[in-house]
């Protein structure tokens, strides 16, 4: 999902861990294989929604997972092999920073988006990015207010602080919290309750199919 400079001025990054290790808190409701399928489907729906945002110059997925890489490439995203060592103490932020170095070569404005937003609407992300333009660094908290759905950096480094209590960590790092409603953008899925909330909003077709085939 790379365009010309006229297509947009933002590089979007999505980091995806190995599918087999992802979303283990969904284990009570899905078999291991179905869980992997659901995680992949959520990525597909997230990418599909993001692709409609006109301000994006590129979409890059960084992942060590071959299936996730293939799905992202099939949707036109740029794919980076995640170089993060297995024993890295902070693998998500390490992966994001690695992607940032590459993406920053073509875009001075960078947005990190979670890849588990099956109810995301294109307009929500577009509106959040428009709001982010008023700040050097900003973020959108998840629906519970503790995590981070989006981190934006305009003309400056990301300094990602994803992980437990990332909303507070991003706030303490100087990022401005964006306060728009954007329910689909805020609804990342880690638990069965999160999935129920996303389904109530309306998930994308890939996730709907994956969830139906338990």
UniProtKB/Swiss-Prot annotation:
Keyword Transferase attributed: yes
One GO MF term attached to the UniProt entry: phospholactate guanylyltransferase activity
Record: residues binding phosphoenolpyruvate: 148, 163, 166
Pfam families: CofC
Catalytic activity: phosphoenolpyruvate + GTP + H(+) = enolpyruvoyl-2-diphospho-5'-guanosine + diphosphate
Pathway stated in the Swiss-Prot or TrEMBL entry: Cofactor biosynthesis; coenzyme F420 biosynthesis
Biological process (GO), any one: F420-0 metabolic process
Name under which the protein is recorded: Phosphoenolpyruvate guanylyltransferase
């Amino acid at each position: 999902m790379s365009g010309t400079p006229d297509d947009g001025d933002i590089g979007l990054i999505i980091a995806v861990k190995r599918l087999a290790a992802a979303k283990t808190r969904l284990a009570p409701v899905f078999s291991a294989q179905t869980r992997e399928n659901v995680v992949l489907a959520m990525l597909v729906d997230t990418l599909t929604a993001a692709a409609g945002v006109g301000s994006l110059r590129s979409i890059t997925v960084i992942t060590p997972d071959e299936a996730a890489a293939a799905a992202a490439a099939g949707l036109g995203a740029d794919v980076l092999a995640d170089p993060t060592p297995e024993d890295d103490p902070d693998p998500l932020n390490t992966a994001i920073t690695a992607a940032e170095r590459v993406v920053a070569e073509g875009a001075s404005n960078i947005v990190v988006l979670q890849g588990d937003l099956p109810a995301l609407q294109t307009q929500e992300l577009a509106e959040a990015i428009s709001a982010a333009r008023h700040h050097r660094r900003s973020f959108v908290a998840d629906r519970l207010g503790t995590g981070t759905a989006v981190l934006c950096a305009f003309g400056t480094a990301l300094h990602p602080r994803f992980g437990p209590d990332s909303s507070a960590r991003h706030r303490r790092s100087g990022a401005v919290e964006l306060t728009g409603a954007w329910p689909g953008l805020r609804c990342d899925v880690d638990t069965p309750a999160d999935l129920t909330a996303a389904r109530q909003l309306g998930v994308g077709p890939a996730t709907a199919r994956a969830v139906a085939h338990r």
